[in-house]
């Protein structure tokens, strides 16, 4: 062997060997590595496989689930998107919250979401799921928005939304999955969580004084005028009182 040639063991110091054999830091995907051609191709293939086989969890608590059930039928045929309904959260990667979420159902929903494998996605379907809907004003048990419990990827407004709207939400979710990268996939950013909803405060309805209300003692002014009934003196304006006094 020529004296000018050195063995591979002489090229590395003992400290460098320790770093190679026993790395301290965890492996991370850097920006340079994420732009690698091979890794980018594998990432696109992985995203294509995921968006082509989204398995939703059968979860429904109210009338919105009827529209979701119609989506499974032959008329709309959502199997063409690769969606296979699952009854177990451990086999699903998508949950469509269809219906009102109550305080008693909230822990069960969070438990189902936590049992789903990552990455997992959530579609909020219907007004009751998004803001509480018609129960948001005086209900003491309805949750005002499912995004206060679990993060939401896509919202579907409506009461209830039609199956075509669910298709539109699934298409938007597929586009979102297609743009995911291996660098940010574990973080699952661009999601909505703990959104504060500003609702208009109104006077309470259930006050216990319903039978004593003025509308129970006499019909409303608009109804009296429409039916040609004599307007009670309490509902008359100043001009109407003057006309009655004049005869």
From Swiss-Prot:
Location within or outside the cell: Cellular thylakoid membrane
Q: Which Gene3D superfamilies match?
A: 3.40.50.12280
Bound cofactor: record note: Binds 1 [4Fe-4S] cluster.
Question: Is Transit peptide set as a keyword in this record?
Answer: no
> What does this protein need as cofactor?
[4Fe-4S] cluster
Q: How does it sit in the membrane?
A: Peripheral membrane protein
Which sites bind [4Fe-4S] cluster? 63-64, 128, 159
Q: Which InterPro entries would you find in this protein's record?
A: NADH_UbQ_OxRdtase-like_20kDa, NADH_UQ_OxRdtase_20Kd_su
Listed PROSITE patterns: COMPLEX1_20K (PS01150)
Has the keyword Metal-binding been applied to this entry? Answer: yes
Q: Which reaction does it catalyse?
A: a plastoquinone + NADH + (n+1) H(+)(in) = a plastoquinol + NAD(+) + n H(+)(out); a plastoquinone + NADPH + (n+1) H(+)(in) = a plastoquinol + NADP(+) + n H(+)(out)
**Residues spanning the membrane:** none
- One Pfam annotation, family name? Oxidored_q6
| Described function | NDH-1 shuttles electrons from an unknown electron donor, via FMN and iron-sulfur (Fe-S) centers, to quinones in the respiratory and/or the photosynthetic chain. The immediate electron acceptor for the enzyme in this species is believed to be plastoquinone. Couples the redox reaction to proton translocation, and thus conserves the redox energy in a proton gradient. Cyanobacterial NDH-1 also plays a role in inorganic carbon-concentration.
Protein name listed in UniProt: NAD(P)H-quinone oxidoreductase subunit K
What organism is the protein native to? Answer: Gloeothece citriformis (strain PCC 7424)
């Amino acid at each position: 062997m020529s004296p000018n040639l050195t063995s591979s063991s002489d090229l590395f110091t003992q400290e460098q060997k320790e770093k190679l054999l026993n790395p301290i830091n965890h492996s991370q995907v850097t920006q340079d590595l994420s732009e690698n051609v091979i890794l980018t191709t594998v990432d696109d293939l992985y995203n294509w496989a995921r968006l082509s086989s989204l398995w939703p969890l059968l979860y429904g608590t109210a009338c919105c689930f009827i529209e979701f059930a119609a989506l499974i039928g032959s008329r709309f045929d959502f199997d063409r998107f690769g969606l296979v309904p699952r009854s177990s959260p451990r086999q699903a990667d998508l949950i469509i919250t269809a219906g009102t979420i109550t305080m008693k159902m909230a822990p069960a929903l969070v438990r189902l979401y936590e049992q789903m494998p990552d990455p997992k996605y959530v579609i909020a379907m219907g007004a009751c799921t998004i803001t509480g809907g018609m129960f948001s004003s005086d209900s003491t048990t309805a949750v005002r928005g499912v995004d206060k419990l679990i993060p939401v990827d896509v919202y579907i407004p409506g009461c209830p939304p039609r199956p075509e709207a669910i298709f539109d939400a699934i298409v938007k979710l597929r586009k979102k999955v297609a743009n995911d990268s291996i660098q940010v996939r574990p973080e699952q950013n661009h999601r909505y969580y703990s959104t504060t909803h500003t609702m208009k405060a109104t006077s309470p309805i259930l006050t216990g004084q319903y039978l004593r209300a003025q509308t129970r003692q006499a019909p409303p002014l608009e109804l009296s005028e429409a039916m040609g009934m004599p307007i009670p003196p309490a509902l008359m304006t100043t001009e109407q009182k003057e006309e009655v006094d004049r005869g």
